[in-house]
Curated annotation (Swiss-Prot):
HAMAP family: YajQ. Belongs to the YajQ family. It comes from the Bacteria. The lineage of its organism: Bacteria, Pseudomonadati, Pseudomonadota, Gammaproteobacteria, Alteromonadales. Pfam families: DUF520 (PF04461). Nucleotide-binding protein. InterPro entries: DUF520, UPF0234-like_C, UPF0234_N, YajQ-like_sf. This is Nucleotide-binding protein Sbal_0710. GO terms for cellular component: cytosol.
């Protein structure tokens, strides 16, 4: 019986490359010339530091653009609502969603069951296991998960026939 896992992961290598590209672009941007601005990556958290709040938002936009260039879904980003002001710099923390939260997993399972496809979906920790009789049913579930607006990107792992 074919089965697959629906997971939500961020490719760490591509994330680090996107942060490095953001640093490079920061060094060449005219509007950041002569300003104090920095991008730091540590433990799935990117810290953006700039002289004012507007520049922090520009850094978020640059990071989003670099992530999409590196094929990392920017919807996995969780940006702090308000920049933290300390001294003469503002800093924003950007976290990346890893794993599927139980609430989103329940919504995904309900969405799959409401689609009337002949598959079974079960929550297993931070992933959703889907089994069915036909490979076509699993591919339909993949399309359904991609189209769903649950606020989190999904990847498909462990596809077995």
């Amino acid at each position: 019986m074919p089965s697959m896992d629906i997971v939500s992961e961020v490719n760490e290598v591509e994330l680090r490359n996107a942060v490095d590209n953001t640093k490079r672009e920061l060094a060449t941007r005219f509007d950041f010339r002569g300003k104090t601005a920095d991008v730091e990556y540590k433990d799935h958290v990117v810290t953006l530091t700039a002289e004012d709040d507007f520049q922090c938002q520009q850094l978020v936009d640059i990071l989003r653009m670099q992530l999409s260039k590196r094929n990392v879904d920017p919807s996995s980003m969780e940006v702090d609502e308000k920049a933290i002001h300390s001294g003469k710099t503002f800093s924003l923390k950007v976290k990346f969603k890893e794993g599927i939260e139980t609430l989103i997993a329940k919504k995904l399972v309900k969405l799959i069951k409401d689609s009337k496809l002949k598959v079974q979906a079960s929550i297993q920790g931070e992933k959703v296991r889907v089994t069915g009789k036909k490979r076509d049913d699993l591919q339909a579930v993949m399309a359904l998960a991609r189209e769903s607006e649950l606020g989190q990107p999904f990847q498909f792992d462990n596809f077995k026939d």
